[in-house]
Amino acid sequence: MSDPEGETLRSTFPSYMAEGERLYLCGEFSKAAQSFSNALYLQDGDKNCLVARSKCFLKMGDLERSLKDAEASLQSDPAFCKGILQKAETLYTMGDFEFALVFYHRGYKLRPDREFRVGIQKAQEAINNSVGSPSSIKLENKGDLSFLSKQAENIKAQQKPQPMKHLLHPTKGEPKWKASLKSEKTVRQLLGELYVDKEYLEKLLLDEDLIKGTMKGGLTVEDLIMTGINYLDTHSNFWRQQKPIYARERDRKLMQEKWLRDHKRRPSQTAHYILKSLEDIDMLLTSGSAEGSLQKAEKVLKKVLEWNKEEVPNKDELVGNLYSCIGNAQIELGQMEAALQSHRKDLEIAKEYDLPDAKSRALDNIGRVFARVGKFQQAIDTWEEKIPLAKTTLEKTWLFHEIGRCYLELDQAWQAQNYGEKSQQCAEEEGDIEWQLNASVLVAQAQVKLRDFESAVNNFEKALERAKLVHNNEAQQAIISALDDANKGIIRELRKTNYVENLKEKSEGEASLYEDRIITREKDMRRVRDEPEKVVKQWDHSEDEKETDEDDEAFGEALQSPASGKQSVEAGKARSDLGAVAKGLSGELGTRSGETGRKLLEAGRRESREIYRRPSGELEQRLSGEFSRQEPEELKKLSEVGRREPEELGKTQFGEIGETKKTGNEMEKEYE
């Protein structure tokens, strides 16, 4: 380092300070130290500049000069925090951890900054690593300790770690590469991977032609190699003081003992690991990281499958739970086939080991997969199997709602309404307003499909009230729109109802008119049947009068003729017995004169038909002309009935009359 006294300084103190800080940040610690020295030449004793140059010396490994500048910065102001911190850092690097801890505490009391707090922590750790913590030391009362004399204690107390000046500046009488003589085994343990670099640099020192070369800055290759070796030696010495080899061996033994103790407590540790893993899997899934949740679940499942039943007594239940977690993550990723397989494995394990809760969980998840892919009937079958396993009212509420929703998708509105009402009832028992809202909407939608618009409006209004309670604006808008549609449906139904009623009234009027016509028709037919009877009665009466007149005339003639007195008496007797004789001989006369009787009977029938057919035919013609367009078949039947009745009546009456006339004529002939 050049002497500023021999040179003429051409800049100012702030310029040299700024230059030194820039070079320090660039890693040019030697040049930065030179700039700070120039600044101190212009303004001697500046404490900030002394601290800055102390940092440069510390980075260069010149610990004594670093400590000297740090102490010089505290001469004018012992409470200067930057100086205290720099002195503590230098003492810590030198391996004097106890004094470094003292200055860290002193600075922390003056200004509780993060640098002092971190310094206290690392100094305490270094002390514990060097001498061990009280928990790792076991005092044993064995043997005779009288050989430990006061002198030996004083000698041991005077043995302090010396500064590493001899490492940085080796003596002239010995080679440079022998400046750091340490145990190779110790150095290998301390340096670790850097030990290979140290061996390489030492091999380069053996090449005499190489070490004689010079660099552009005037430095020799030998100086560069020695700088690297000294750096490694310095840090290995620091690491040995920070954590000596015996401390490393002690820690290794402590780790082995700890592992043995942990191995004995493995069941509890395993349970903690499992619970923590399941919480992480669930947290990843709920936070939206389905891929991370799936990877974590598969990793834990692979590890659990390697364990035996002794380590994890409920291994089967745990495996089923992990399959369920994997399936849920696969659902979120859209891997429905894989999710279905995972949940079916969970169901198989639950059935095999009789785990009701796991079975309920698996059926729930399988139903969700079926519903996601549109297989609503399979989802219904799966969820209906889960109904007996549902324990809480809230679980039943959700289950009934999902089943009803599937029935609604299948256009089975009655079933959807039934399950919706069950869900509504369970939600009211639970007091869950959110599920009351969902159930009311489901019931209303089913009633709309059933065209029960009034009930649908009532349920939509209930759902709207609950949506306002939970401040669900989207649900409110959807329900209002559905209410409008339901009200329009009511109007349409009312219009249809009025039309049907009018049509019904019209049809009833026509039916009553038709009945009146039928009654009128029946009256006409009765009149048709009654007219032949009246004609027959009138004809019988006229015949009786005629016979009476004839008898009176004959009786008068008999009285006028005295010669026929005897005949008149006999004729009177004959008349008195005429009815009995005619009645008694009617059978014999009919038998004897069959031919004559049949001819007379047929003649009488023809006469009656000609007489009685004429008015019935005219009536039939009139009625057929009036009603032929409406009821032709019924009119034909009635006309045939009307035709048959007078014919039968005529046959009966005219047969008897013909026989009576025949008998009377024969009696008169015999009497004459």
Swiss-Prot record:
TPR repeat start and end residues: 13-46, 48-80, 81-114, 275-311, 320-353, 360-393, 397-430, 437-470
Pfam family, one: TPR_8
GO biological process: brain development; cerebrospinal fluid circulation; cilium movement; epithelial cilium movement involved in determination of left/right asymmetry; heart development; lung development; mucociliary clearance; outer dynein arm assembly
GO cellular component term of the entry, any: cytoplasm
Tissue: Expressed in the nasal mucosa (at protein level).
Disulphides: none
Localization of this protein: Cytoplasm, Cytoskeleton, Cilium axoneme
Start and end residues of each stretch annotated as Disordered: 527-672
Chief location bin: cytoplasm
UniProt xrefs under InterPro entries: ODAD4 (IPR040111), TPR-like_helical_dom_sf (IPR011990), TPR_rpt (IPR019734)
Biased composition (Basic and acidic residues): 527-544, 595-650, 658-672
SUPFAM superfamilies: TPR-like (SSF48452)
Biased composition (Acidic residues): 545-555
Disease affiliated with this protein: Ciliary dyskinesia, primary, 35: A form of primary ciliary dyskinesia, a disorder characterized by abnormalities of motile cilia. Respiratory infections leading to chronic inflammation and bronchiectasis are recurrent, due to defects in the respiratory cilia. Some patients exhibit randomization of left-right body asymmetry and situs inversus. Primary ciliary dyskinesia associated with situs inversus is referred to as Kartagener syndrome. CILD35 inheritance is autosomal recessive.
Primary role: Component of the outer dynein arm-docking complex (ODA-DC) that mediates outer dynein arms (ODA) binding onto the doublet microtubule. Plays an essential role for the assembly of ODA-DC and for the docking of ODA in ciliary axoneme.
Subunit description: Component of the outer dynein arm-docking complex along with ODAD1, ODAD2 and ODAD3. Interacts with ODAD1; this interaction may facilitate the recruitment and/or attachment of outer dynein arm docking complex proteins, including ODAD1, ODAD3 and ODAD2, to ciliary axonemes. Interacts with components of the IFT complex A, including IFT140, TTC21B/IFT139 and WDR19/IFT144, and the IFT complex B, including IFT46, IFT52 and IFT57. Interacts with CFAP53.
Entry-linked PANTHER family: OUTER DYNEIN ARM-DOCKING COMPLEX SUBUNIT 4, PTHR23040
Protein name as catalogued: Outer dynein arm-docking complex subunit 4
